[in-house]
């Protein structure tokens, strides 16, 4: 995490400072692996404790000009779900930044009239109270300029959330909705807990409001999704008429369930 990277940077910086070089060692940095110069062995240091999200420093207050900038912001880290292609499924922990701290930082961006803030929370609306608190805040503090981007699971949205976002200024928020596939066999195999018909219903309800840009995602190359199946997935989503349809290709990430079962699926990458 951030502490590990900071210490690693300090170590390499010290290499150029002969006075401090003797006091720094990779073995003192928890949470890394490195190759020892002498033994040529791979050394694993002590694991590092999971960092408190609220202790991560806010670094954007050092920027003077926010015009034409996109800010990436994180109010939570981790995901409660187990999608097999995602590394978040390996670490089941889900933690949040203090909500009052989040509001303070978002107000800073709003006051600076940042054009767009992209939340990188893996599933922003996995916690109803957290999502509602932030959505209410951005609605109440709308400056008429800043746009907020959220990655959500559409089938999790309830009536209270839908009512709130339906009353927002057009362009205040945009929603990226991960579908990945409409093949039920594929959805089950990749461990997604997605209610497809509910997702379609929610997408149409949001469209009816005419105030929110919808961005729907698909992944090509998933297990049991051949050309014909993917064509159907594409057609199913295209027929929903999203503002944007994003097609990504499967990335087999080391350590993920997908990586460990790649041979079984016959994946070539």
Predicted regions and their residues:
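Catalytic cores of alpha/beta
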Residues: 161-165, 223-239
């Amino acid at each position: 995490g951030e502490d590990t990277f900071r210490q690693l940077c300090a170590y390499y910086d010290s290499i150029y400072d002969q006075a401090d070089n003797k006091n720094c060692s990779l073995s003192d940095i928890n949470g890394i692996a490195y190759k020892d110069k002498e033994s040529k062995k791979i050394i694993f240091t002590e694991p590092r404790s999971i960092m408190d999200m609220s202790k991560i420093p806010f670094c954007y207050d050092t920027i003077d000009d926010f015009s034409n900038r996109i800010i990436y912001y994180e109010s939570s880290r981790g995901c409660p779900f187990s999608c097999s292609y995602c590394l978040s499924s390996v670490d089941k922990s889900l933690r949040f930044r203090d909500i009052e701290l989040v509001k303070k930082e978002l107000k800073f961006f709003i006051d600076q009239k940042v054009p767009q803030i992209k939340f990188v929370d893996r599933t922003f609306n996995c916690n109803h109270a957290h999502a509602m608190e932030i959505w209410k805040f951005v609605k109440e503090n709308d400056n008429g300029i800043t746009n907020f981007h959220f990655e959500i699971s559409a089938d999790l949205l309830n009536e209270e959330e839908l009512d709130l976002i339906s009353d927002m200024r057009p362009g205040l928020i945009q929603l990226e909705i991960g579908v990945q596939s409409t093949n039920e066999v594929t959805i089950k195999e990749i461990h997604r807990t997605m209610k497809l018909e509910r997702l379609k219903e929610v997408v149409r309800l949001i469209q009816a409001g005419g105030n929110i840009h919808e961005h729907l995602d698909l992944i090509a190359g998933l297990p049991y999704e051949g050309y014909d199946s993917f064509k159907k997935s594409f057609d199913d989503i295209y027929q929903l008429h999203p503002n944007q349809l994003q097609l990504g290709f499967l990335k087999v990430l080391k350590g993920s369930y997908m990586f460990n079962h790649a041979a079984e699926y016959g994946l070539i990458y």
